[in-house]
Design a protein with these regions (language model features):
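Active-site metal-binding loops of divalent metal-dependent hydrolases
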Residues: 13-15, 240
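Short, conserved phosphate/pyrophosphate- and ester-handling motifs at nucleotide-, phospho-/glycolipid
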Residues: 38, 178, 238
Length: 282
């Protein structure tokens, strides 16, 4: 089922309605934060997201800002989360609503035509292993946000565990894990041996304002954060980082350089929040 693809990245993921520190509902999900990342990276990029039609008006500013870069598909429900920040690197989360599942019909409706597809699951059930296999069969290289490995599809306080199907890893080319997710997956310290056991060719473990580690071919490279941005809430920072990282990898950047560019983008965007006080859809 392979076809001619163009160099670039298509981001697939569910929309989310976020309630942050008790504030009014705001747009969430990777689609709400990836646009600025794709623009910064340049090249071919597209975002396809799903959510209930009655919620689409909340995401109108996203479509107004990015135009044809963003496509929103209808679904029977929209993901929902509550986030309460303790500091720039720590927060408490709960699940208000479990979002739709991406299957063959949804992939065909999105119809990605880029060499890379970045999957941005909010919970473990968003992208089943069969969907990852389908994307691989279509000829795409697949990047995957590791919160989809560890986040259980359960309402209430967010539960993270390692009970993910092993075949979720089979068709991945890049796996991104936040520090807490890496600890869950490794059942302790995440090191080169754990990376080798997972079998994904390229694994990026992020440490918030401390930077990230990149595991490739048995080696580990540390990339420091571009600069620290303090006293700002960081919703969407991981989405921006990963979308920018994958877009730069699709454009031919080496892993370390892709991480540097992604880190610089996130720092710039977080600095903007110091002045506006909220995570605009970017």
């Amino acid at each position: 089922m392979s076809r001619e693809l163009v160099n670039g990245v298509t981001v697939l993921g569910n929309l989310a309605i976020d309630v942050i520190n008790g504030a009014p509902r705001s747009p969430g999900g990777c689609a709400s934060f990836a646009g600025v990342a794709l623009q910064a990276a340049g090249g071919r990029g597209r975002i396809v997201a799903m959510g209930a039609e009655q919620d689409h008006t909340l995401f109108a500013p996203l479509r107004e800002r990015f135009g044809d870069l963003v496509m929103i598909l209808p679904a029977d429900r929209t993901s929902g989360f509550r986030l309460d920040y303790e500091d720039v690197d720590h927060r408490r989360m709960s699940v208000d609503a479990i979002g739709p599942v991406w299957g063959r019909a949804e992939v065909e409706a999105a119809d990605p035509d880029t060499t890379w597809v970045h999957l941005a699951p909010l919970l473990r059930t968003d992208f089943p292993a069969e969907t990852l296999a389908l994307l691989s069969e279509r000829g795409h290289r697949v990047a995957y946000d590791g919160q989809g490995l560890v986040r259980a599809d359960r309402l209430g306080p967010l539960v993270e565990d390692s009970h993910f199907p092993a075949d979720l890893l089979t068709h991945l080319d890049i796996l991104k894990l936040a520090e807490d997710e890496a600890v869950v997956v490794a059942d302790g310290e995440f090191d080169a041996a754990v990376a080798a056991r997972l079998g994904v060719p390229e694994i990026v473990v992020t440490y918030g304002s401390e930077g990230c580690d990149i595991h490739v071919d048995g080696t580990v490279s540390r990339v420091p954060a571009a600069w620290r941005v303090l006293d700002v809430q960081t919703t969407g920072a991981g989405d921006m980082f990963t979308a920018c990282y994958v877009a730069n990898r699709a454009a031919g950047a080496e892993p370390t350089r892709a991480a540097e560019l992604a880190s610089e983008l996130v720092a710039r965007e977080l600095e903007k929040r110091l002045h506006v006080g909220s995570p605009d859809p970017v």
